[in-house]
Amino acid sequence: MSLAPTFAVIAAVLLGGSDFFAARSARSTPSLTVTRTAVAVSVLLSPLSLLVVESKWTARDSVIGALAGIAMITGLMLLYRGYKVAPMGVVAPIASVLLAAVPVVWDVINGVRTGPTVAVGMALGVVALVLTSYTPGGEGSATLGAALGLSSGIAFGVAFTLMGEVSKGAGMAPVIVQRSAGLVLLLVVWLVRRDPLIATGPGLRYGALAGVLGLTAIGHLQMAFQRGASGPVSVASSQFATVAVVLAVLFNKERMRWWQAMGVAATAVAVALIALGS
């Protein structure tokens, strides 16, 4: 059995944890400042990944890594903007589904075919994303929220697709470039907006934790893409939304709605099917 699903699931768990701590930090700190803090920490620590995984620097993989980093941060900024001006229940499901769908479409275009078990797992995984990320209520424009969710999901999907184009021998080198390019974009945004550069107090602590987990997650995600098809890996790793919901229920005492519970169960089955068929 391929190690790709294993790395993808580890990435999903770590991304969910990173998202959870970023949300904690955002209680006292602007979301872009939290993101900048987390990415800065990940950039500082990213060279350590070269000690763990044998890596090779190439111009092609470095360019792909930089483009993936820019796309990922663009997706985050569009997502946060969507959360600010529209109901989360509109923005999140659309972004989550497209995040997973874009790499699947790319696989189809390139003639990559999956077995029936993996295909069912991927379809169920997309359903699970909608169930776990949907929350009712909220204020703002549903139309604008849908547009921002759509653009955010496409940006994330492009980032994931680009990560799938990195050569296996590159190891963690593209991850370092990806994180660095993302930080450069965030610094450019800071020069324009002049919001707080780095989080302070509790926001700094939680933001730093989000950065550590985020870097580790992206490293595992890159290894997953280097070992498997983009579609199954993207669907399995995108289940981090489920992890974030479970952590919020366990530690923030948030209520899990019945459809979210169904989504959690669907996630478990979907990941199992993808792993069995890979």
Feature map (PLM): residue ranges:
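Structural signature of hydrophobic alpha-helical transmembrane segments
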Residues: M1-L15, E54-M72, G111-V127, L150, ...
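Membrane-interface interhelical linkers
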Residues: M1-V13, G17, F21-L67, L76-A86, ...
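Hydrophobic residues within membrane-embedded alpha-helical segments of Major Facilitator Superfamily
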Residues: F7, L14, F21, V41, ...
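Signature of the 12-TM Major Facilitator Superfamily
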Residues: T33-T37, V90-I94, P116-A119, A173-V177, ...
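Alpha-helical transmembrane segments of compact multi-pass small-molecule transporters, enriched
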Residues: A40-S46, I94-V108, A181-L185, A217-H220, ...
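Membrane-interface helix-loop-helix junctions at boundaries between adjacent transmembrane segments
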Residues: L79-T117
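Hydrophobic transmembrane alpha-helices of multi-pass small-molecule transport proteins
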Residues: A101-V105, T114-Y134, W259-S278
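Selected transmembrane alpha-helices and immediately adjacent juxtamembrane segments
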Residues: T143-A173
